[in-house]
Amino acid sequence: MKTASIITVGSEIIEGIILNTNEKYICYKLTEAGLKVIRTISVDDDIESIKNAVNYSLNDSDVIVLSGGLGPTEDDKTREAIAESLKLKIALNEELKKAIEKRISKYHRYVPSNIAKQAMVIENAKILENHVGSAPGQLVFHKGKILVLLPGPPQELEPMLNNALNEIKPQPDLSTLSMLFFSIPEAELDEIITSIVHDTSVKIATQASYFDGVRVRLSAPKAKAEELTKLSKKIIELTGEKFIGYGNITLEEAVIKLLKKKHQTLSIAESCTGGMISSRLVNIPGASEVFLGAIVAYNNSVKRNILNVSNKILEKYGAVSQQCVAEMAEGVRKIMKSDLALAVSGIAGPTGGSEKKPVGTVYFCIAGESIKDIQRLFYPQQRNVFRSRVSAYGLYLILKCLSNML
């Protein structure tokens, strides 16, 4: 199996200013493409640091992916470092320079002169077009090794990495299969899977997330692809409604897909999540076909005046109650004229809890023409973790309803 190293360039990474999300994405895509990632390294914006990381990785890596350091500023030094490391020339590509300047002039009146730095191309490198930003990537084939240079911003890096992998065309020795599960502990899921896997060549990797549940990756030699498919079906039989979907699917993707399949529309009334559930849904292209809208009723006055939650309910039971979420769901469903409505109200903390309703208490209601399901859950975590867990369970509740599993 071909090996790969990932080098992330940027002082903002090693100083802890920003989270290195690129590393996770690149690891996933390289593994999916059949490459074995053997190391990840983060280095400063320094030519010698970059060169040292590259030279070290050249010893045992077939592919090296570098992200960051391709901008126009003084501290963008990845191109120069690679050229020096490989002892290759680097020169200004006039045609590329004009293309970059033309792109920038569409959005800005002034085109800085230092933008020409982004048109410096390493000898014999293939240019990777950037359709989002201004910094092109480069693909360098050198003495049997492949170096992929990508910009740092994730929205630029991700499509460019996919294009680079199409150019490289690695031949995977492994067959891989990914699955997403929700509302089942990682340990329990792992126990279920390991109890039915008796082939030592089948590898199991699980990753739990408050945002999406548990993602499982099964891998085996390519010749056993059919066995992996059979294994996945057996896992689904044993986990039932906990299975969300195959591949890199998310809860929100699954919701939009199933709403379309069932020809149902959805509206949401959010309190403690502050619009997080709605935000996740609108990340999915085509969501407007089935997701009509949402009301963030964070203050009781909005619950009362917009969603028509009665004063009696708010005074007697409080905003965090089954009675309140029931009226919130019916209120938003009537306003939006949707088939289904979800309402959530909870106590995110750190204050506001009581003995009967401690911080972390949350109520959900999903309502339809002949459907009403109310649930109370308890997530005693830090505020943003609480909101992530509530948003995820809200999406899962919609899926369960649509799948007639309530």
Swiss-Prot record:
CDD domains: cinA. InterPro entries: CinA, CinA-like_C, CinA_C, Competence-induced_CinA, MoaB/Mog-like_dom_sf, MoaB/Mog_dom. SUPFAM superfamilies: CinA-like, Molybdenum cofactor biosynthesis proteins. Pfam families: CinA (PF02464), MoCF_biosynth (PF00994). HAMAP family: CinA_B. PANTHER family: NICOTINAMIDE-NUCLEOTIDE AMIDOHYDROLASE PNCC (PTHR13939), NMN AMIDOHYDROLASE-LIKE PROTEIN YFAY (PTHR13939:SF0). Belongs to the CinA family. This is CinA-like protein. It comes from Pseudothermotoga lettingae (strain ATCC BAA-301 / DSM 14385 / NBRC 107922 / TMO).
